[in-house]
């Protein structure tokens, strides 16, 4: 049996209007990307990318989107994303664009990148904050994310099947 290889595009919906993110739906976003691929690459691009294309993850609050497509045609999807200029949902049109953050072979690599990306964003916010209350809240978030990462790393080591460090032979 042959495994189908996919690529995952981790994108961020960037918009000045905060209502744009709150009205996001995976069905609408998937249709928008498919229509844009058809407009940019024609019927060949639409047919090639429709096989295996899916919106795997969508967070309406942060605007993070994870798109899955076949490995052979991920460049077609990737090259069509800059042509998305607005999101139309429920009769409203919101100007926005998709910023591609990472292209990965697994969902896990995209998750690891997203954790690092969010940590960098928190550190940038920490440098730019003016109020002491904001500064404490951001420092608390950074500390919490570091503690969660250490716990998950500890769990991965304990799940390695009992192959901890061996004692050196003398």
Swiss-Prot record:
Query: Residue positions of the PTM Phosphoserine?
Result: 158, 160
Write out the annotated subcellular location: Nucleus, Nucleolus
Q: Where is this region: Disordered?
A: 149-170
Could you tell me which SUPFAM superfamilies the record lists for this protein?
Rnp2-like
Q: GO biological process annotations for this chain's record?
A: rRNA processing; tRNA 5'-leader removal
User: Is Iron-sulfur given among the entry's keywords?
Assistant: no
Which domain of life does this protein belong to?
Eukaryota
UniProt KW tRNA processing keyword: yes
Q: What GO molecular functions are on record for this protein?
A: ribonuclease P activity; ribonuclease P RNA binding
Record field: transmembrane? none
Coiled-coil-forming residues are none
Q: What does the record's miscellaneous section state? A: The last C-terminal 19 amino acids are not required for complex association and RNase activity.
Assembly behavior:
Component of nuclear RNase P and RNase MRP ribonucleoproteins. RNase P consists of a catalytic RNA moiety and 10 different protein chains; POP1, POP4, POP5, POP7, RPP14, RPP21, RPP25, RPP30, RPP38 and RPP40. Within the RNase P complex, POP1, POP7 and RPP25 form the 'finger' subcomplex, POP5, RPP14, RPP40 and homodimeric RPP30 form the 'palm' subcomplex, and RPP21, POP4 and RPP38 form the 'wrist' subcomplex. All subunits of the RNase P complex interact with the catalytic RNA. Several subunits of RNase P are also part of the RNase MRP complex.
What does this chain do? Component of ribonuclease P, a protein complex that generates mature tRNA molecules by cleaving their 5'-ends. Also a component of the MRP ribonuclease complex, which cleaves pre-rRNA sequences.
Q: What is this protein called?
A: Ribonuclease P/MRP protein subunit POP5
Organism listed in the record: Bos taurus
């Amino acid at each position: 049996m042959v495994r189908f290889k996919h690529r995952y595009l981790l994108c961020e919906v960037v918009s000045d209007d905060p209502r744009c993110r709150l009205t996001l739906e995976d069905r609408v976003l998937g249709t928008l990307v498919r229509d844009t691929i058809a407009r940019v690459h024609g019927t060949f691009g639409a047919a090639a990318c429709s096989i295996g294309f899916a919106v795997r993850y969508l967070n309406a609050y942060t605007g993070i989107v994870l798109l899955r497509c076949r490995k052979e045609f991920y460049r077609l999807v990737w090259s069509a994303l800059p042509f998305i200029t607005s999101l139309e949902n429920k009769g409203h049109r919101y100007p926005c664009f998709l910023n591609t953050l990472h292209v990965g072979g697994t969902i896990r690599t995209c998750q690891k990148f997203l954790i690092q990306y969010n940590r960098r964003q928190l550190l940038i916010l920490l440098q730019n904050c003016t109020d002491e209350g904001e500064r404490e809240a951001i420092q608390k978030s950074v500390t919490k994310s570091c503690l969660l990462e250490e716990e998950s790393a500890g769990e991965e080591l304990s799940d390695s099947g009992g192959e901890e460090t061996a004692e050196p032979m003398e």
